[in-house]
């Protein structure tokens, strides 16, 4: 808390270059809590000193990993996401998601959990069916059965989504399956966030490959 209260914003510059369609960001030797390039002139001087030098690749590292679907929304995480994407205040987001609830297109909004209870699982296919005309991403999920089994043909039931121990009176915010007609522009945007987050929860985990390339120019 002390560090937050005493934080002083500072302007700094970053040095980047594109080489063979790849963006490289410079790592400069700096002292802790200090910035290497504190003025535009300093940055330009550095660029001029290395712009005619060759860029030497020093290492290439590839790592495979798994990217999981983001958790379903509780009220706080929805407010954060709406502020990030649409610059909505927390109060504005609450008013919009409350309106969507009153229109019966999303579930109760004032929740602090990102999980669903087990009794929701058998209802998922009907919810997906109700919003299929609005989201083409639903199509691959429609043939899946909510039978709790693992493997092809079954709707996933992940502990990252379903956990009775982490649900009290109300579960995470999800679509109800009612047709989301007659929504305002902002209501549509917030509804889409909720619906797409819900749909993503039933997609397979994404296998990703990250490549880190280190290069140097000059000494």
Locations of regions flagged by a protein language model:
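Core catalytic DNA strand-manipulation module of type IA topoisomerases
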Residues: 1-219
């Amino acid at each position: 808390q002390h560090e937050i209260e005493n934080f002083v914003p500072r302007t700094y510059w970053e040095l980047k270059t594109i080489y063979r369609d790849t963006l490289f960001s410079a790592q400069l030797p700096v002292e802790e809590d200090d910035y290497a390039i504190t003025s535009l002139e300093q940055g330009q001087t550095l660029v001029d000193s290395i712009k005619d030098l060759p860029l030497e690749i020093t290492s290439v590292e590839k790592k495979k990993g798994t990217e999981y679907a983001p958790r379903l929304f509780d009220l706080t995480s929805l407010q954060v996401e709406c502020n990030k994407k649409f610059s909505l205040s927390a109060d504005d987001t609450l008013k919009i998601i409350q309106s969507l609830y009153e229109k019966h297109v999303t579930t109760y909004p004032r929740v602090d959990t990102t999980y669903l209870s087990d009794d929701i699982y058998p209802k998922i296919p009907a919810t997906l069916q109700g919003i299929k005309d609005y989201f083409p991403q639903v199509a691959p999920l429609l043939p899946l059965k909510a039978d709790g089994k693992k493997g092809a043909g079954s709707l996933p039931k992940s502990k990252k989504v379903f956990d009775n121990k982490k649900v009290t009176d109300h579960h995470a915010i999800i679509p109800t399956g009612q047709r989301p007609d007659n929504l305002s522009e902002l209501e549509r945007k917030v509804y889409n966030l909720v619906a797409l987050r819900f749909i993503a929860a039933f997609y397979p985990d994404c296998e990703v490959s990250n490549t880190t390339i280190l290069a140097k120019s000059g000494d």
